[in-house]
Design a protein with these regions (language model features):
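Charge-rich, low-complexity N-terminal segments
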Residues: 1-46
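Short, Lys/Arg-enriched charge-dense amphipathic segments
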Residues: 1-2, 58-73, 112-115, 127-129
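Short, solvent-exposed coil/turn linker segments
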Residues: 7-10, 77, 104, 114
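Generic recognition of short, well-ordered alpha-helical interface segments
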Residues: 18-21, 25, 67, 119, ...
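Short, conserved beta-strand/beta-arch hydrophobic-aromatic motifs that form part
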Residues: 43-103
Length: 129
């Protein structure tokens, strides 16, 4: 857990103004849609910082702040994979490729999406449903 959570200014500087807008859009969507606990930590290999959204010990998703972009990580268990497959055609080809290329572990399919702009925001909202 981070002792000092990065400020909006620090995130804006790290991500860049355009990418920071996307970050804020996704964070605001999650906060408006779900009641979640937010946990900050160092991002290790995935980014400088990680912002994890959790409820009752279960993680909804994690954002990894990086220089000029960020990663959006979601882990799909069996039921979430079935939901994705049932509405697969609603997702862009790029998101389908991220899904297909993601590794499946004992606890689910770990999908990491690199975010540089608003291109995947609607897909991400659909992935969170």
């Amino acid at each position: 857990m981070l002792e000092n959570i990065p400020t909006q200014e620090e995130l804006n500087e790290l991500l860049g103004a355009k990418v920071f807008e996307v970050w804020e859009c996704i964070v605001n969507y999650i906060n408006e849609t779900y009641v979640m606990e937010t946990l900050w930590d160092i991002g290790r290999k995935a980014g400088k910082y990680e912002m994890k959204f959790r409820k009752g010990g279960k993680t909804l998703c994690t954002l990894y702040a990086r220089e000029g972009n960020f990663g959006f990580m979601i882990i799909y268990g069996k039921s979430e994979r079935e939901k994705f497959e049932n509405k697969r055609s609603l997702f862009s080809e790029k998101i389908q490729a991220y899904y297909d290329d993601a590794k499946t572990y004992h606890d689910g399919k770990w999908i990491m999406i690199d975010i540089f702009d608003f291109a995947h925001v609607e897909d991400i909202k659909n992935m969170l449903e």
